[in-house]
Amino acid sequence: MAPRVATGTPEPNGGGGGKIDNTVEITPTSNGQVGTLGDAVPTEQLQGEREREREGEGDAGGDGLGSSLSLAVPPGPLSFEALLAQVGALGGGQQLQLGLCCLPVLFVALGMASDPIFTLAPPLHCHYGAFPPNASGWEQPPNASGVSVASAALAASAASRVATSTDPSCSGFAPPDFNHCLKDWDYNGLPVLTTNAIGQWDLVCDLGWQVILEQILFILGFASGYLFLGYPADRFGRRGIVLLTLGLVGPCGVGGAAAGSSTGVMALRFLLGFLLAGVDLGVYLMRLELCDPTQRLRVALAGELVGVGGHFLFLGLALVSKDWRFLQRMITAPCILFLFYGWPGLFLESARWLIVKRQIEEAQSVLRILAERNRPHGQMLGEEAQEALQDLENTCPLPATSSFSFASLLNYRNIWKNLLILGFTNFIAHAIRHCYQPVGGGGSPSDFYLCSLLASGTAALACVFLGVTVDRFGRRGILLLSMTLTGIASLVLLGLWDCEHPIFPTVWAQQGNPNRDLNEAAITTFSVLGLFSSQAAAILSTLLAAEVIPTTVRGRGLGLIMALGALGGLSGPAQRLHMGHGAFLQHVVLAACALLCILSIMLLPETKRKLLPEVLRDGELCRRPSLLRQPPPTRCDHVPLLATPNPAL
């Protein structure tokens, strides 16, 4: 029998069954002696094997994760994505599950869109009747005459057109030498609603801080939900968190609409934000973990577009309802119907999470239901699918343990580096968005519609832009481009600040001034560009974070990233808290941080067409490709050819 010599290169990282078997047979020559390796193996065959290895390294892109997960080795274990295809779970059943995961995003978007209109300050003035003394509605000082009272009332009537709750003491409404409004306030109405909580409890002037407090608490509710509900999602499952939070959103929203004081409204709004964050986090995880690498971007953008549709839908519902309490019930009470998601076999748990947690029987049941949905009614699964399900534990080998301590997490520095960069990028992308306000963002109904439609429209355009470019140029490259455009828009707007506040404002404000019109057009253009690019950066940083965080800690890691994004939204209430003072300095700081993000993004790995990491070891291998050093043309084998004994000899 002719001897066989192993010429293959073992798979790195201790593949365990993933060794490339390139053994060749060495035949004896005519004189009975064994020839050389060059005589037995043709040069073309060795060159073909090297080309195949080079193609495998090229697909990996020099990335550690790509070399360990993307290289297809037949004897090795199947990935979860390959298991989905082998079982037949990709198809109509998968699309139905993804659709069920996208539907709750609509109500999350409705809840987010409600806060700006619920806290919008309506035009107001002090209620007064005719002009006899002490009947103007303002408190009269001790030494004021009746003539001064009438004159002051007329001045108040003229000044009432510009009053807002952001005035520190409503001095723009108060007549000279008068203190404060003794009677009720008259409100001229809101763009879409007749009244809101501000008009019901007169949260203006000295009580205006309660409105800003409500905005801050609502945002902190989202941040707390993202941060604290990530651990239960990793510990008890994604499905349970989604069902629990969806079931509580309805009672919380109805209770907030029935609250009898502003304090009760603020407390329930905080709880509502907490629950909506849990819904958003849970369904995002379930959508992402059910897709193969080619579907992840489309599914993520589909969820974002559903959210954009929710913002547009909210404007229509507000125009129909007119009352803020009825509108609150309308957007939250239907969430109680999501309790039907608890019906067995309808809304399924993440099979990827079940496999990582070693719940094999539950994972088999979920995969079987997904596969049966893709087949005609009554048709059995194929033999290959049945074998894959029965041998699931051996097909997808599990880690030694799925539990770990916090101290062990500190050893995975690469995971923490990716979390830090993406969290910082997401924070800046959300925080700087408030600085991009086009000219004319006042309190009139047309300005309100302009700002609302502009924010939603740029988000939709960002989704279209990402869908066209990301799969072609990669996640990291488009994220770098988005943050670069954000930084450019901020720097240009800061340069236009001096033109907006010139030395001679009287000459500048003249009607028909071409320089003034040109400046307003430039501010509007770069504001739209900044909104567009910051929306794209926020969407892509969240997706990239979900793709580099391992399944075992994906709920906690992604929750941290999304919580930082929610905290970035505090820049708006913080600026209103100081009545707009310091807006220029805030924009300067955020623009500098955006430039820092550009440098940090180059340290991130590329996840395009890569498998999701399952355990911490896989997440630690998510490293950036080399910027200067190219991968070698072939993988060098430093092991001597005959170093390993061959049992065939």
Swiss-Prot record:
Glycosylated residues, chain numbering: N134, N143
PROSITE patterns according to UniProt: MFS, SUGAR_TRANSPORT_1
Primary location class: membrane
Localization in the cell: Cell membrane; Vacuole membrane
Domain of life of the source: Eukaryota
Membrane-spanning segments: 211-231, 240-260, 265-285, 300-320, 330-350, 414-433, 448-468, 477-497, 526-546, 557-577, 584-604
Any Pfam family the entry gives: Sugar_tr
Segments for region (Disordered): 1-70
GO process terms (BP): intracellular iron ion homeostasis; siderophore transport
Induction comment from the UniProt entry of this chain: Expression is activated by RUNX3. Repressed by the oncoprotein BCR-ABL; BCR-ABL misregulates expression by inducing a switch in binding from RUNX3 to RUNX1, a repressor of 24p3R expression, through a Ras signaling pathway.
Reported tissue expression: Expressed in brain.
Biased composition, class Basic and acidic residues, residue ranges: 47-57
InterPro entries, A to Z: MFS_dom, MFS_sugar_transport-like, Sugar_transporter_CS
GO cellular component: organelle membrane; plasma membrane; vacuolar membrane
Lipid bilayer topology: Multi-pass membrane protein
Key words, A-Z: Cell membrane, Glycoprotein, Ion transport, Iron, Iron transport, Membrane, Receptor, Transmembrane, Transmembrane helix, Transport, Vacuole
Biased composition (Polar residues): 24-34
A GO MF term: transmembrane signaling receptor activity
Family: Belongs to the major facilitator (TC 2.A.1) superfamily. Organic cation transporter (TC 2.A.1.19) family.
Main function: Cell surface receptor for LCN2 (24p3) that plays a key role in iron homeostasis and transport. Able to bind iron-bound LCN2 (holo-24p3), followed by internalization of holo-24p3 and release of iron, thereby increasing intracellular iron concentration and leading to inhibition of apoptosis. Also binds iron-free LCN2 (apo-24p3), followed by internalization of apo-24p3 and its association with an intracellular siderophore, leading to iron chelation and iron transfer to the extracellular medium, thereby reducing intracellular iron concentration and resulting in apoptosis.
Name this polypeptide is given: Solute carrier family 22 member 17
Taxonomic source organism: Homo sapiens (Human)
